[in-house]
Amino acid sequence: MASPDVEYRCFVGGLAWATDDRALETAFSQYGEVLDSKIINDRETGRSRGFGFVTFKDEKSMKDAIEGMNGQDLDGRSITVNEAQSRGSGGGGGGRGGGGGYRSGGGGGYGGGGGGYGGGGREGGYSGGGGGYSSRGGGGGGYGGGGRRDGGEGGGYGGSGGGGGW
């Protein structure tokens, strides 16, 4: 009963900003028929977020691609290829996918941002400041930007904090 819903999809991370959907499809098509290839772009800037997905027609092609492409060079960047986690979560999974914004900072923004998360939970300004301190790879800026939920000005601090990666 679940077989029509099964997708043989790979998550591809560490992509160069210059890599587009077509380049992704070309790189992976050697492993089997590619049904879809999609680079995820930032909603505000339109620039690549450095990851995407490739959907294959069958499981063997997907597994061969993971085996063959993980750790390989694509457009000058060493990429990470894993099986995409897509089961059982439309809305919930989307929320966690968006949460990948603070994970993509290397985890430092999320872990170090604990000060901003706990201490600045009510005050957007403090949350944004915490994001700035914890942003070793600029990831803290994304998390600080999340402070906008608490106050519109917190987002502003988060944005500038992200630029000053430590």
UniProtKB/Swiss-Prot annotation:
A Pfam entry, by short name: RRM_1
GO terms under biological process: RNA metabolic process
Name of this chain's protein: Glycine-rich RNA-binding protein GRP1A
Gene3D superfamilies reported for this sequence: 3.30.70.330
Biased segments, Gly residues type: 88-146, 153-166
PANTHER family: HETEROGENEOUS NUCLEAR RIBONUCLEOPROTEIN 87F-RELATED
Tissues where the protein occurs: Predominantly expressed in meristematic and growing tissue.
Keyword Nucleus: yes
